[in-house]
C-alpha cells in the first residue's frame, strides 16, 4: 500500500469552499479510480493566521495505481481547476510512503 501525502493552504474565507469541493467532487472522483483505497483530509487553522492548512493522505494499492491516477510525473500534485483557484499556495511535490503498519 502506498500513501500519497500532500499539503495545500487556502485563505480563511476559502477554506469551507475548498473542503466542500473535496467532499463533493474530488473524493467521489478518486473513489472511482482502480487501486484507490481511501483517504483522509486534515484541516488546521491557527490563531492569528489568515491561512488554513489542508493535508491530504490518499491510499493506493501500489505505485502503479498512483501512476495511473497522476501520470508519469506522479510526484507533481493533481488539481481540479476549481481547487487550484481556491488554494492560496501549494506544496509543489507530493510525497509517497510505503504503508508498513495499518491498525
What are these regions (language model features)?
Residues 12-38, 74-82:
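Short amphipathic alpha-helical segments
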Residues 9, 42, 57-59:
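Short hydrophobic/aromatic beta-strand micro-patches
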Residues 16-20, 51, 62-74:
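Short amphipathic alpha-helices within nucleic acid-binding modules
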Residues 9, 61, 72, 79-80, ...:
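Mobile, glycine- and charge-enriched loop segments
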Amino acid at each position: 500500500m502506498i500513501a500519497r501525502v500532500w499539503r495545500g493552504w487556502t485563505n480563511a474565507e476559502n477554506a469551507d469552499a475548498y473542503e466542500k469541493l473535496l467532499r463533493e467532487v474530488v473524493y467521489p472522483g478518486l473513489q472511482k479510480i482502480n487501486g484507490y483505497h481511501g483517504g483522509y483530509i486534515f484541516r488546521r487553522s491557527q490563531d492569528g493566521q489568515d491561512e488554513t492548512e489542508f493535508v491530504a493522505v490518499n491510499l493506493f494499492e501500489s505505485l502503479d495505481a498512483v501512476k495511473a491516477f497522476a501520470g508519469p510525473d506522479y510526484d507533481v500534485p493533481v488539481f481540479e481547476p476549481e481547487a487550484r483557484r481556491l488554494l492560496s499556495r501549494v506544496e509543489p511535490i507530493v510525497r509517497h510512503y510505503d504503508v508498513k503498519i495499518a491498525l
